[in-house]
């Protein structure tokens, strides 16, 4: 075997080893790339799910906030109406002799009965 053929054989072996190493490295990189893509897809799905859940929670909080505001406004309107009615009645009976007499027991019982039925039908706002 001559020096040229030995050099050529050595270059061929070196090229084969180098090509094999590069081929292995390329295959390993492809496998890692596929794994990273799957992990990225899983993380993106988890993020989308979390965003969807958070959006649902935000909408729920907005609904409850609107309900709370409506209840507060209704309570304030009821209080205002009650106060206005009380003032109108007080003004209307001022100076009338019926304002100094006690309410008959039968009338008071009837009013209590009406109040109980009204609260039972519409719910007791004092309990809310």
Swiss-Prot record:
A GO CC annotation given for this chain: membrane
Function of the molecule: Component of the spanin complex that disrupts the host outer membrane and causes cell lysis during virus exit. The spanin complex conducts the final step in host lysis by disrupting the outer membrane after endolysin action has degraded the host peptidoglycans. Host outer membrane disruption is possibly due to local fusion between the inner and outer membrane performed by the spanin complex.
Lineage, broadest ranks: Viruses, Duplodnaviria, Heunggongvirae, Uroviricota, Caudoviricetes
Location relative to the cell: Host cell inner membrane
Subunit structure: Interacts with the spanin outer membrane subunit. Part of the spanin complex which spans the entire periplasmic space. The spanin complex is composed of spanin inner membrane subunit and spanin outer membrane subunit.
TM region positions: 7-23
Coiled-coil features, chain-numbered ranges: 24-51
Species name: Escherichia phage Mu (Bacteriophage Mu)
Keyword Cell division assigned: no
Record's note on what induces expression: Expressed in the intermediate phase of the viral replicative cycle.
Biological processes per GO annotation: killing of cells of another organism
Annotated protein name in UniProt: Spanin, inner membrane subunit
Keywords assigned: Coiled coil, Cytolysis, Host cell inner membrane, Host cell lysis by virus, Host cell membrane, Host membrane, Membrane, Signal-anchor, Transmembrane, Transmembrane helix, Viral release from host cell
Protein's membrane topology: Single-pass type II membrane protein
